[in-house]
């Protein structure tokens, strides 16, 4: 029985590859008591037997999409999740995709394996709330990562869950560069030339030990499944979680995003993916500029900016801008707000993530 299923799946996958068209296939018939293996020309996924008869799939040359059968037939879409393979991160980063790992075919071709979810409700919302999904849809949607862990290369290659995602596996050369900068005492000019924060030097001035005051943290700030590297200050109180350098992965290689210093630093919001740039423009001006790190890019995506500017309006110095001018690199069209409304809008962003940075002293060898 299993060999027959695999033969049918292989034929379907070949047809999809040859025609370049989506192929609608109903899998997991209620009469079958065997797990169902769904394949395309790159990878396969095994679905448990207890899901048989509850889902449908659409298979293409590089992805497999899963639909709740009941919701789909009722006219509500039914899309639950999609697993896809991409040779280049630029083919998928920036959308709804989250990386799950990497698949290497027998001939050495490397693919990102990613998962994506619906952007809107795909079941009968007239009878169910969002957190009260139909039972079969919920099993499909909530079990998606468990099903995705069964991914296998169809040609005998390997799939590594979590590969190419975790900071400790990605940023070793960058960490080594900071260790060298601390050991050799690079000055501010050298650090700037290397696109590194001058705080590496500032935190090590005099009798201070930069390796104990500066650290690093790995965290996926933009929810694409791949960690960013944050270089921050080890401190307590309101400054805990402050960082000065951001690195991300671009086409599977580390890339520097932005640098700051003590009067132009960064903090990650506790909820969501936004980063706050806290800055001071003098005794009477300070503000917070919020942005997101663009997936697979060294660029940032500005969101909104707040500032108190007594130079411009000493009586009501509260301003908000939702308009960033990419050509000049400046926020424009600032709107003046009463203090109460300004503070209310600021409060919507919540608290900061008080990150615990790993001191560089823990990775420095004693010579």
Indicate residue ranges for each PLM-predicted region.
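Secretory pathway targeting signatures of secreted, lumenal, and periplasmic proteins
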Residues: 46-99
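Acidic/hydrophobic-patterned starts of short beta strands in beta-sheet-rich repeat architectures
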Residues: 222-233, 271-278
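Bacterial lipoprotein signal-peptidase II cleavage site
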Residues: 22-30
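C-terminal motif of bacterial Sec signal peptides marking the signal peptidase cleavage site
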Residues: 17-20
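Short, well-structured beta-strand
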Residues: 97-165
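Acidic, small-residue rich beta-repeat scaffolds with periodic aromatic anchors
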Residues: 37, 144-185, 278-367
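Repeated scaffold domains used in trafficking and secretory/extracellular systems
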Residues: 261-270, 312-316
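Beta-propeller blade termini
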Residues: 212-221, 264-274
């Amino acid at each position: 029985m299993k060999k027959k299923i695999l033969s049918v799946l292989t034929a379907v996958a070949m047809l999809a590859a040859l025609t370049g068209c989506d192929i609608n296939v109903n899998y997991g018939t209620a009469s079958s008591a065997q797990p169902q293996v769904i394949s395309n020309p790159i990878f396969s996924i095994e679905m448990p037997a207890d899901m048989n008869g509850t889902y449908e799939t659409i298979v293409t040359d590089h992805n497999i999409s899963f639909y709740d059968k009941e919701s789909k037939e009722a006219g509500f879409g039914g899309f639950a999740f999609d697993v896809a393979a991409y040779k280049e991160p630029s083919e998928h980063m920036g959308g709804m995709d989250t990386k799950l790992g990497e698949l290497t075919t027998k001939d050495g071709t490397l693919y990102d394996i990613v998962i994506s979810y619906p952007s809107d409700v795909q079941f009968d919302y007239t009878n169910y709330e969002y957190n009260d999904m139909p039972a079969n849809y919920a099993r499909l949607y909530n079990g998606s990562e468990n099903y995705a862990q069964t991914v296998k290369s169809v040609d005998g290659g390997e799939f590594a869950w979590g590969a190419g995602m975790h900071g400790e596996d990605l940023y070793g050369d960058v960490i080594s560069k900071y260790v060298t900068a601390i050991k050799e005492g690079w000055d501010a000019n050298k650090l700037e030339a290397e696109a590194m924060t001058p705080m590496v030097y500032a935190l090590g001035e005099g009798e201070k030990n930069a390796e104990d005051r500066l650290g690093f943290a790995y965290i996926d700030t933009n929810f694409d499944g791949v960690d960013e590297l944050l270089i921050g200050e080890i401190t307590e109180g309101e400054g805990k979680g402050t960082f000065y350098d951001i690195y991300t992965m671009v086409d599977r290689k580390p890339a520097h995003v932005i640098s700051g210093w003590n009067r132009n630093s960064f903090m990650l919001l506790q909820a969501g993916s936004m980063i706050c740039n806290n800055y001071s423009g003098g005794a009477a001006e300070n503000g917070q500029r919020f942005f997101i790190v663009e997936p697979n890019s060294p660029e940032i995506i500005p969101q909104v900016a707040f500032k108190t500017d007594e130079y411009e309006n000493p009586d009501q110095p509260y301003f908000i801008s939702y308009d960033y001018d990419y050509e000049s690199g400046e926020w424009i069209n600032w709107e003046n707000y009463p203090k109460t409304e300004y503070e209310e809008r600021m409060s919507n962003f919540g608290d900061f993530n008080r990150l615990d940075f790993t001191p560089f002293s823990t990775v420095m060898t004693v010579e």
